[in-house]
């Protein structure tokens, strides 16, 4: 413990401004006053264990959680894609590919459809010209101009209808990229504090046009949740007691299965009929809160974290030592 007043102690420190103070490269080393929690963070990142941090607001819990992403390997990151299901349109298929390939697959598929659409348009145009020529010859022989006009109207309508149907059917074959990653990216850090069920667990958007050829395919309306976006990374939830018990139970299921299907969360929405295959969500959960908040957690969820992870009580104050005073200077810098 340092008894010397801060003003006198600062006179013994040789620097002109905080720009001269060296800053650690890693985020975990920039956290001050939480040495024990920093050690646990390193272990949890290495062992891929869940964590529950208990402490007052403003004690560095979210910063410690974000620091885990720098300590985790990024070799296994994946893109998650959603495909149309020919057998059941309300159960879209889910596939994963290495990070960076999903965007390329979608672009390649769009290019293939563009080329196919051009070939189809040329074929339809050739057929339309043949039919138009036949109508013209028939009109010349019969001398009835109304027959030609009526035939051309039917021909134009049929051409546009067939072309639009083919284009819409082709577009529905393009997969949707639910979770996009890039090669070399750090593992994701997703802060899901205060999110609703749809944002946390995923949702299916409502389709106002559900028939008549104007409907949107189910796989295009699927939206990934925070648990899916955190696949391969860290999911941070502060004040976890604010989640309803049903949402905490679903979160526990996702942690256990490492995959969770996406379904419509609103009973009055057309998306309620849609439920995808299980979507990968292998994440590290870092939950946080104060003592009162933790007491209102789902018992099974807390038991899972304590049994297969770490429960840490973060410090609310730090000792007045010379080392900690230097760390405060670094924090200001």
Predicted regions and their residues:
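Conserved ASCE/P-loop NTPase catalytic core
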Residues: 1-322, 331-333
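FAD cofactor-binding and catalytic pocket of flavoenzymes
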Residues: 327
């Amino acid at each position: 413990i340092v008894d010397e007043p801060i003003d006198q102690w600062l006179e013994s420190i040789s620097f002109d401004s905080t720009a001269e103070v060296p800053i650690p490269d890693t985020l975990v080393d920039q956290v001050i006053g939480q040495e024990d929690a920093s050690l646990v963070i390193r272990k949890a990142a290495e062992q891929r264990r869940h964590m529950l941090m208990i402490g007052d607001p403003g004690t560095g819990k979210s910063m410690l959680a974000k620091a885990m992403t720098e300590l985790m390997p990024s070799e296994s990151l994946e893109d998650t894609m959603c495909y149309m299901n020919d057998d059941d349109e309300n159960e879209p298929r889910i596939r994963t590919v290495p990070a960076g390939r999903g965007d390329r697959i979608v672009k390649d598929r769009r290019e293939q459809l563009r080329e196919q659409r051009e070939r189809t348009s040329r074929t339809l145009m050739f057929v339309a010209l043949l039919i138009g020529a036949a109508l013209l010859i028939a009109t010349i022989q019969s001398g009835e101009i109304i027959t030609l006009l009526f035939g051309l109207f039917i021909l134009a309508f049929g051409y546009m209808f067939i072309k639009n149907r083919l284009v819409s059917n082709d577009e529905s074959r393009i997969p949707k990229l639910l979770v996009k990653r890039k090669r070399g990216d750090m593992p994701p850090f997703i802060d899901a504090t205060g999110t609703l069920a749809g944002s946390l667990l995923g949702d299916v958007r409502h389709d106002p046009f559900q028939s008549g050829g104007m409907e949107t395919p189910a796989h295009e309306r699927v939206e990934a949740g925070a648990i899916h976006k955190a696949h391969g990374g860290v999911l941070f939830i502060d004040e976890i007691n604010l989640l309803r018990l049903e949402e905490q139970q679903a979160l526990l299921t996702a942690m256990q299965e490492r995959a969770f299907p996406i379904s419509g969360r609103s009973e009055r929405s057309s998306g309620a009929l849609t439920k995808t295959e299980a979507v990968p969500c292998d994440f590290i959960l870092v939950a946080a809160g104060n003592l009162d908040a933790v007491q209102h957690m789902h018992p099974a969820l807390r038991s899972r974290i304590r049994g297969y992870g770490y429960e840490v009580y973060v410090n609310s104050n730090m000792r007045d030592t010379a080392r900690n005073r230097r760390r405060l200077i670094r924090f200001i810098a």
